[in-house]
Curated annotation (Swiss-Prot):
Residues annotated as binding L-aspartate: K93, R182, R237
Family: Belongs to the aspartate/ornithine carbamoyltransferase superfamily. ATCase family.
Keywords for the protein's UniProt record, in alphabetical order: Pyrimidine biosynthesis, Transferase
Catalyzed reactions per annotation: carbamoyl phosphate + L-aspartate = N-carbamoyl-L-aspartate + phosphate + H(+)
NCBIfam families, A to Z: asp_carb_tr, PRK00856.1
Name of protein: Aspartate carbamoyltransferase catalytic subunit
Presence of the UniProt keyword Cell inner membrane in the record: no
GO MF annotations in UniProt: amino acid binding; aspartate carbamoyltransferase activity
Amino acids binding carbamoyl phosphate: R65, T66, R115, H149, Q152, G278, P279
Length: 319
């Protein structure tokens, strides 16, 4: 079956979504990321894999962790990194997305890292590059609308593998605003592909997408029930900027029912880890005692994200 992310040899040429990628490619990325962890421990944190290549960061939405870690990752691969200031670019004057891409291609771009509010924007760019015969230029999706955030999903998988080793023995809970979360979608596809036997979605009915059961996900509206005996708890923030209409009574009411407190975390396994893609809203989806506690691996997630993004860019570029 045709997959726009793969070249004619079945190798990863763009990373647009975790969905549809074979398990072997996910493991290739995770294994490559593990090898890059050593680079971050060196005095000189550089490898020459993208020397002479130009990486353009195109962030049409705000970002701290993702944009910064992509920039660090590209520089550690020895790439030349160009951060396009969208507010000062011709895009703010009405230039179309594909016209922007064509102009950057004329500047000898090799790889685009794209975050966009519109679902499917990275696919549009990848298809355009193929149509104009630029198979030598690669696209990495850094988050598109509510659709996907594949590198966040992959760094979450790396974090889980680092602490739990065997995916096939795990019970993983994803808690919060799953309806609007591109991270949740990427995590669910990655977890099921890697063989996690039980993925749980916990949240109010208004914040859970329909048909999660068709993805093999177990749905819980009671957080206490959903957390029982879980090995991994992934907390999500409320995506207020993507909500239309009143989906929640109040932040305080939400915290009472779905905020992760030490008491609720105690229902999971004693060695359960707590993850969060950031930014965190303390006192809304997570209590500070949990966020700063011994079971939280939120800051290691950020560290692992550099190695994972190094792996993704290196692999799509043909290394």
């Amino acid at each position: 079956m045709y997959n726009p992310q793969l070249n004619k040899n079945g190798e990863l040429s763009h990373l647009l979504s975790v969905e549809g990628l074979p398990k072997a490619i996910l493991n290739q990325i995770l294994d490559t990321a593990a090898s890059f962890m050593e680079v971050s421990a060196r005095e000189v944190k550089k490898v020459p894999l993208l020397r002479g290549k130009s990486v353009f960061n195109l962030f049409f939405e705000n970002s701290t962790r993702t944009r910064t870690t992509f920039e660090i990752a590209a520089k550690r691969l020895s790439a030349d990194v160009i951060n396009l200031d969208i507010n000062k670019s011709s895009a703010s004057k009405g230039e179309t997305l594909l016209d922007t891409i064509d102009n950057l291609c004329a500047m000898h771009a090799n790889l685009f890292v794209v975050r966009h509010a519109s679902s499917g924007a990275p696919y549009l760019i990848a298809e355009h590059l193929q149509r104009v015969g630029r198979d030598d230029i690669h696209v990495v999706n850094a988050g598109d609308g509510r659709h996907a955030h594949p590198t966040q999903g992959l760094l979450d998988m790396y974090t889980i593998r680092h602490y739990k080793k065997d995916f096939t023995q795990l019970r993983v809970a994803i808690v919060g605003d799953i309806l609007h979360s591109r991270v949740a979608r990427s995590d669910i596809h990655a977890l099921t592909t890697l063989g996690v036997p039980e993925v749980r979605a916990i949240g109010p009915e208004t914040l859970l997408p329909k048909h999660l059961d068709k993805l093999g996900v177990h749905v819980f509206h009671d957080m206490n029930e959903g957390l029982k005996d879980c090995d991994v708890v992934i907390m999500l923030r409320l995506q207020n900027e993507r909500m239309t209409g009143a989906l929640l009574p109040s932040a305080g009411e939400y915290f009472r029912h779905y905020g992760l407190t030490p008491q609720k975390l105690a229902l999971a396994k004693p060695d359960a880890i707590v993850m969060h893609p950031g930014p965190m809203n303390r006192g809304v989806e997570i209590h500070s005692a949990v966020a700063d506690g011994s079971q939280a691996v939120i800051l290691p997630q950020v560290t692992f994200g550099i190695a994972v993004r190094m792996a993704v860019m290196s692999i799509v570029a043909g290394n």
